[in-house]
Amino acid sequence: DNNGDDKPDDKKVLFNVIGGKQHDHGIHAFCFGPDGKLYFNFGNASRGLKTPDGKIIIDKAGNEIKDHRKPYQQGMVFRCDPDGSNVETLGWNFRNNWEASVDSFGSIWQSDNDDDGNRGVRINFVMEFGNYGYRDEFTGKGWRDKRSNIEKEIPDRHWHLNDPGVVPNLIQTGAGSPTGIIVYEGKMFPQLLNQVIHCDAGPNVCRAYPRKNIGAGYNAEMMPILSGGKDKWYRPSDVAVGPDGSLFIADWYDPGVGGHGMRDLERGRIFRVIPKDHNGYSFAKRNVNTLDGAINALMSSDLESRYLGWKSLHKMGIDKTEKSLMKLISDNDLSLIHI
């Protein structure tokens, strides 16, 4: 959008994939990280990442980004520059990972879906360059194949969790159809600060996953935020944080879920979630073309404002911005977690 009319003025292809176009195991979303890079993923239908002219991309580690166990396979997570260059493969061996979310400290979180019906939906802390166990690391065999030290329970067996080198899951949530995910960095819900919030269209629920440190990673518990109850057409597909810190949940509203199916093409809903004692919807307007406005945007609850602030500050350059940013950091204000 070059002229501010909220309409794209041109279109540029960043990547192609081998397969999985218009597929629920394909590419779904990009996320802007605090390092100025783009984060994204694809499920196991995509099978590889290609340049716009169809060449397999070689990542920064010198490997082909391709499902061929050298070393990558199945679904993958990536990081790249805004123009699509300098691609890094951050994790692999997922099945149907939907979206990667990056918090202000650079940690990456996502969900993954099991072979439907095996109660193995999982949330992952993406430890960079990790193998996440959907298929055997060396043979590519599935979880049903016999192997030594096989897990007792199918949800654990599904991800080869006893195999050496497989990164443990943050939490497994049972059956479901996981969709959008964020890390909450607003002030309206202090009990959710820095916690993962995630939609699951299968059991008709949006949940938070408060976590605790364990070893080099984390574990978590489930905390429902907005459930469908008796309304089985409630299919939360994404969650976002508003500039005031409230939550917005998108519901595609359909009787079914999965398998590319949809029966209601006309209706959808958006819910806003606020504390019981909160009224209204207001937030400060910012002019990101000024230094103060860009810094204030960088401290916003919502990622979109932070992106605009980050972009403006980088355009201004270090000579104009460094003094003000260093003063803010020295103030030690909780709202500065986004810098």
Show where each model-derived region lies:
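Beta-propeller domains with acidic blade repeats across secreted/periplasmic ectodomains
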Residues: 1-296, 304-315
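Short inter-helical turns and helix N-cap capping residues of alpha-solenoid HEAT/ARM repeat scaffolds
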Residues: 301-302, 332-335
